[in-house]
């Protein structure tokens, strides 16, 4: 009996050791799995969440921002991964970052630490003045409007591009462009010049030459067409009219150029006193085209000039039905009748 009792007592520590081993094994597996999930599993609550950093910050500070906006499923897991990767004090460069769907903490940290930005879509819209363009572009980029505007007037920089203060607006083409948010103003303009040169391929240059126009002169005429009509089907007709006047050596007498010279775009009405304004943009006073575009025209207006309609019209006047379309005329007498009809409609 005593022998059996001794053997039973010896089994007790073995059971304890076995149980402890199992507990430690399970705990170890759980811990390793927990670490693995912290590092490698998806932790994005808001796919497409965007971060704009004007200056470099630490990953710890960025974690605070992500927590505040509830962008992550488990911010604690993100912080633990920072410790494991010894990246808490790492700097995140200024830039635009975007969280992708199914992104792990490790992927996010590597993205931030390496400064791998997500490009932004920048829209170049119609603008009349450099100030308007600068405000619009700066609202989509990291640089300031003042910095951009200063460069638009930098004579030495413009000279290096073969441009001047009149023609610089002509290289901006209405479109959407993909680029990095932190691009400098200088590189932005160089990108626009590259896009301009790409647009003016051999076919378009030949089409311009057939009309005795340079690419910039096409842009300038297109800007007048852009301001004259919003009707796409009417643009080639308007372009053809102004080309007719140029070929005959007539002054363009385009009201939009008078409004541009006046600097007041609040009203489309042009008064007799406006026609006498001394300005290199007033086509009632100057021969030929103004020295540069009066706005950033759409590509459809540019194409309307390159593929202008052939017709005998020399005059145009807004239709009295206020449809936005115009009546076209070959003679001054016909034009005067159209003009009187428009005046009567205004007085009603």
Task: Name these PLM-found stretches.
Residues 3-47:
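N-terminal type II signal-anchor transmembrane helix
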């Amino acid at each position: 009996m005593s022998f059996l009792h001794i053997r039973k007592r010896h089994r007790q520590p073995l059971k304890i050791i076995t149980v402890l081993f199992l507990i430690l094994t399970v705990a170890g597996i759980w811990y390793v799995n927990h670490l693995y999930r912290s590092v490698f599993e998806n932790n994005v609550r808001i796919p497409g969440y965007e971060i704009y950093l004007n200056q470099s910050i630490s990953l710890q500070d960025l974690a605070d921002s992500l927590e505040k906006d509830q962008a992550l499923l488990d911010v604690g897991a993100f912080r633990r991964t920072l410790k494991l990767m010894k990246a808490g004090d790492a700097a995140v460069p200024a830039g635009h970052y975007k969280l992708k769907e199914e992104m792990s903490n490790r992927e996010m940290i590597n993205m931030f630490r390496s400064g791998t930005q997500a490009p932004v879509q920048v829209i170049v819209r119609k603008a009349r003045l450099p100030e308007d363009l600068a405000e619009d572009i700066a609202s989509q980029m990291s640089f300031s409007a003042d910095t951009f505007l200063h460069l638009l007037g930098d004579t030495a920089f413009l000279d290096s591009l073969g441009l001047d203060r009149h023609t610089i607006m002509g290289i901006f083409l209405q479109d959407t462009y993909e680029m990095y948010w932190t691009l400098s103003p200088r590189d932005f303009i160089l990108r626009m010049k590259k896009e301009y040169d790409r647009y003016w391929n051999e076919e378009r240059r030949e089409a311009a030459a057939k009309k005795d126009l340079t690419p910039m002169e096409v842009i300038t005429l297109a800007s007048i067409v852009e301001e004259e009509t919003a009707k796409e089907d009417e643009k080639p007709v308007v372009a053809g009219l102004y080309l007719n006047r140029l070929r005959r050596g007539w002054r363009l007498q385009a009201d939009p150029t008078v409004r541009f010279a006046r600097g007041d775009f609040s009203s489309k009405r042009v008064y007799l006193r406006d026609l006498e304004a001394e300005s290199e943009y007033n086509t009632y006073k100057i021969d030929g085209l103004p020295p540069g575009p009066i706005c950033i025209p759409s590509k459809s207006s540019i194409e309307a000039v390159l593929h202008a309609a052939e017709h005998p019209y020399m005059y145009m006047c807004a239709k009295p039905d206020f449809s936005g379309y115009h009546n076209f005329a070959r003679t001054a007498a016909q034009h005067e009748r159209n003009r009187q009809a428009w005046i009567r409609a205004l007085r009603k």
